[in-house]
Regions:
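C-terminal ends of transmembrane helices
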Residues: 44-55, 104-116, 169-175
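Membrane-helix boundary elements
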Residues: 17-21, 70-90, 108
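Terminal transmembrane helical module of multi-pass membrane proteins
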Residues: 136-182
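Short, strongly hydrophobic alpha-helical membrane anchors
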Residues: 1-25
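Alpha-helical transmembrane segments
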Residues: 22-35, 86-100, 153-162
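Hydrophobic alpha-helical transmembrane segments in multi-pass integral membrane proteins
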Residues: 72-81, 131-147
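Juxtamembrane helix-loop boundaries in multi-pass membrane proteins
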Residues: 15, 22-32, 52-73, 115-133, ...
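N-terminal signal-anchor/start-transfer transmembrane helix
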Residues: 31-49
Length: 182
């Protein structure tokens, strides 16, 4: 993929940030990796039913599974062949707003189930996740106006969601094993 630079009104634009076709291999890898991790996590959660007894464990399980599923769906949306910049922009903008609203609702449900002493720390740990989620509608808006980064906004989302989901999955499996020993 060639990096094409274009000068527009004193700024340098990177055309590939606005063309989904140039990202096919990347999003194919994201979809494949996320789908594989989702399957592994689903099996691990099925084998460790003790996890769903605790509100924090349920919250982590939901975050890990939903984060990976969101990455699969996000990748599939970008991989739709022949899709123009504007339709993709609208899909990301609307989908990202809906995603954030539902995410906040589910996190509020988790927080209310936690002991009050653990709530501030839980809410604080969610800041990177929600900032990464807000990058999805930012990518959509950027595609719609044709400036400010386009699909590059999704890179932090993908990195944060992969790291977040993998870390949560690991913590769940390790904590479940520790609790079974006790």
């Amino acid at each position: 993929m060639a990096c094409v630079r274009q000068r527009t009104k004193g700024r340098v634009g990177v055309d590939y940030a606005y063309q989904a076709d140039g990202w096919q291999a990347f999003y194919g890898a994201v979809a494949g990796a996320s789908a594989a991790l989702t399957g592994l996590l689903f099996v691990a959660l099925s084998l460790n039913s003790v996890i769903v007894r605790d509100a924090a464990h349920r919250g982590r399980a939901r975050e890990a599974l939903s984060g990976l599923l969101i990455l699969v769906v996000l990748a599939l949306i970008v991989l739709i062949p022949g899709q123009g910049q504007r339709p993709l922009g609208w899909e990301l903008l609307v989908g990202g707003v809906v995603l954030e609203v539902f995410g906040l609702r589910l996190q509020a449900e988790t927080v209310t189930g936690l002991p009050s002493a653990h709530r501030p720390r839980w809410v604080t740990r969610l800041v990177p996740l929600h900032l990464a989620t807000l990058a999805v509608p930012a990518a959509g808006a950027s595609l719609l106006v044709g400036r400010y980064g386009g699909l590059l906004w999704l890179l932090p989302t993908i990195l944060v969601y992969l790291i977040w989901s993998t870390t949560n999955a690991w913590m769940l499996v390790v904590q479940a094993a520790n609790e079974e020993r006790q």
